[in-house]
Structures are given as structure tokens and as C-alpha cells.
């Protein structure tokens, strides 16, 4: 159970769940452990990774968490800040990357995912991001599509120390925040995925 020992903005309620935004530097070791325990349940194939870390390839700037009335973390999203390069004109855009978006199984089907995503996007807009980007498997395209996300059909490139610049596999989705649309052309993430 996580007590109210964390600095957050005012919580948004969804049924008995309080959704709140917390900056990464305000996450205590106790809260980080609770997040990792939840991620292990939601992403069992990545148990070894999430037993050690509560983020994937890029450290979050902030997170949106859902806490039930008993104080347990039941939903999570980590948000990564990145300046990407889009299209032949090399247009720079500041995006918020959605990482490890998940809800515990007992809380799925209640509308919590939709409410959490709306909090994520409102906060991204408030923080001045041009757009949101997420990466997902094919079976999640429809889920995110119902939340207003659009599939991005051009190529997306990542850069890492081992392989240099490479084409990313999987699906990329876009959500306009302070920019009305994504420029046409390929995306260079200017780093690894998140």
C-alpha cells in the first residue's frame, strides 16, 4: 500500500480510483517498488526487467498513476520527453512518449484506461508537447484508436550505440496535442525507443 507521502497534483477520480500525475524525481523508493510490482503483473514476459527497473529504455519525466481506495497502484503510464525529427524538411517536434501504459487485470473493462489516457493527454498538452507518440502491437491498434490515436504509416527510425540508426518494427501511433497534425514523412526518434 502506498500512502499519501508523494508530491502530486490534484487527483482525478474514476470510480474508486484516484488518478494523479507525479514527476519522476518525486517517486520514492517505496513507490518505485509498488510500480515495479504492478508492471510485473501487467507485463509477465518482461518480469526480469521490471523486477529491477520501473522504466523501459528511457527514463520518464513524469507518470500518471491510478491508486485504489486501499492505496495500491492499479494503473500506470510513464511519460518520456523527446525531440524527434519528422519528414524531408527535418521538422523538429517535441513529443511525449507513452511508455508501459497498463491497468491491472481486475480493473480492466471499467473505463479506467480511457480516463487514464485522457489525464495523460491533458497533462501532455498542459506541458506544451506538440504530440503524443506510442508504440504497440497490432492487437492494441484498435484499443488506442478508440482513444483517438492514429496509426502512423511512414517509417520510424531509432538510434542506439550498438546498431546506429535502424528501422523500428511494430506499430507507431500519433495523437495531436499542441500541433494539429504530424508533418508527412519518416520519423527519426533521435535516440532509442522508450
Model-derived regions: residue spans:
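Conserved catalytic-core motifs of GNAT/GCN5-like acyltransferases
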Residues: 21, 135, 145, 150-173
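Conserved acetyl-CoA pyrophosphate-binding loop and the N-cap/start of the following alpha-helix
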Residues: 106-119
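Acidic/histidine-enriched, beta-strand-rich ligand/metal-binding domains
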Residues: 99, 108, 124-127, 142, ...
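A conserved beta-strand-loop-helix scaffold within acyl/acetyltransferase catalytic domains
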Residues: 22-102
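Conserved N-terminal entry element of GNAT/NAT acetyltransferase domains
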Residues: 1-29, 190-191
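C-terminal "cap" of GNAT-fold acetyltransferases
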Residues: 158-194
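Residue-level recognition of the GNAT/N-acetyltransferase active site
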Residues: 104, 137
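Conserved GNAT acetyl-CoA-binding A-motif
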Residues: 122-136
